[in-house]
């Protein structure tokens, strides 16, 4: 009843009010930290992890299967969405779960990099917007909310990217952006080269990982969920942020994705018509032009379940692992159980005609 009442109240309040309350709390936290006298922080230049792997997918494509597979290796520490088998006790005892969104989301590290370009640096409106989006993204992040010990790292990064904070009582600079109503301070971005920005981000991420996993490291390869986005760009684009990073992309029969989206009404995945879905999938797959990228491995979800040993061998070769590292084999990913999901989309006859049409339009993304 309490949750229902909270939902009703939130639906009545202007969205901008909620957002600004959150954003202003970040600045309040920051100001308190500055007054504490403990604000002299230097980021780590080395990381406790030797290498990194990001697991990407095209949306409901089964990438969590590879996350579960890599949990079984003693060489890996996995940071991913909470698995079904993780108890609430595990989470309360320090389990770290969730997609890593600090880089890819609006206001994240990649966004700030884009805004660091000369055009944004000289445009006060864009710079102010960039900093406020950063504040919003950080305050809403699970890491900031659930791991308060990391907050000084975010405050320090905030200081590094902002050149000036002008305290104002007049209406905010970007008056047309209602979500910024009530936040009247004006921010400017610090001018820095790409090399300087990459180093800042790299050391910030190292410090964050070192703090979060200081006593939880189970392997020297950190596995992350969609750290830089959804399959786009050659991995060399992201190496300045995290050296020694590789990517595994999991794709799936798009008919299975479509039926799942329809059954669950997955609103962020276009499925109101076959045409809309096909357009979405073409766009998602088009962005992943990585044929010459030696640091990317693409796997088919169906093959992982039906040709388990062969696909596992591919993963091991790609990451430089051996079968001896696979110490918890089939503990988290059991193909004998999971393969029941391979052709389950055929069972729902309601979407049979749609699936036939999808096969006609994009056969290259269908399996079998």
Can you name each region flagged by the protein language model?
Residues 1-198, 334:
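PAPS-dependent sulfotransferase catalytic core
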Residues 2-48, 52-53, 289, 294, ...:
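PAPS-dependent sulfotransferases, especially Golgi type II membrane carbohydrate sulfotransferases
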Residues 80-84, 251, 326-330:
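A generic structural motif
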Residues 89-95, 260-263, 310-312, 339-341:
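Short aromatic-enriched loop/helix-cap "lid" or pocket-rim segments at secondary-structure transitions
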Residues 98-109, 269-276, 344-353:
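A polyampholytic, Gly/Pro-enriched intrinsically disordered region
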Residues 126-136, 298-303, 337-353:
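Short secondary-structure transition/capping segments
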Residues 152-326:
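PAPS-dependent sulfotransferase catalytic domain
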């Amino acid at each position: 009843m309490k949750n229902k009442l909270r939902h009703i109240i939130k639906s009545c309040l202007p969205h901008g009010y909620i957002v600004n309350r959150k954003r202003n709390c970040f600045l309040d936290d920051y100001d308190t930290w500055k007054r504490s006298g403990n604000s002299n922080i230097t980021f780590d230049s080395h990381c406790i992890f030797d290498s990194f792997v990001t697991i990407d997918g095209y949306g409901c494509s089964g990438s969590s299967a590879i996350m579960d597979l890599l949990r079984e290796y003693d060489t890996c520490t996995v940071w991913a969405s909470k698995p079904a088998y993780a108890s609430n006790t595990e989470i309360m005892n320090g389990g770290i779960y969730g997609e890593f969104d600090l880089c890819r989301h609006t206001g994240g590290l990649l966004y700030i990099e884009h805004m660091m370009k000369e055009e944004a640096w000289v445009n006060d409106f864009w710079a102010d917007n960039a900093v406020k989006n950063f504040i919003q993204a950080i305050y809403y992040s699970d890491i900031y909310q659930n791991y308060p010990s990391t907050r000084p790292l975010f405050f320090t990064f905030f200081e590094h990217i902002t050149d000036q904070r002008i305290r104002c009582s007049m209406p905010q600079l970007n008056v047309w952006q209602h979500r910024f109503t009530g936040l009247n301070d004006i921010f400017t971005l610090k001018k820095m080269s790409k090399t300087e920005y990459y180093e800042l981000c790299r050391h910030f991420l190292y410090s964050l990982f070192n703090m979060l996993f200081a006593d939880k490291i189970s392997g020297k390869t950190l596995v992350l969920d969609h750290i830089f986005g959804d399959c786009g760009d050659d991995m060399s684009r992201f190496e300045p942020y995290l050296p020694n990073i590789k990517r595994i992309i999991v794709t799936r029969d798009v008919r299975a994705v479509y039926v799942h989206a329809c059954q669950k009404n997955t609103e962020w995945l276009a499925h109101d018509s076959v045409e809309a879905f096909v357009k979405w999938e073409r766009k998602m797959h088009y962005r992943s032009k990585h044929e010459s990228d030696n640091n990317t491995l693409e796997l088919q979800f169906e093959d992982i379940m039906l040709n388990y040993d062969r696909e596992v061998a591919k993963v091991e070769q790609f990451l430089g692992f051996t079968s001896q590292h696979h110490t918890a084999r089939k503990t988290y990913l059991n193909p004998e159980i999971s393969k029941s999901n391979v052709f389950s989309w055929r069972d729902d006859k309601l979407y049979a005609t749609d699936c036939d049409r999808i096969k006609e339009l994009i056969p290259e993304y269908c399996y079998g």
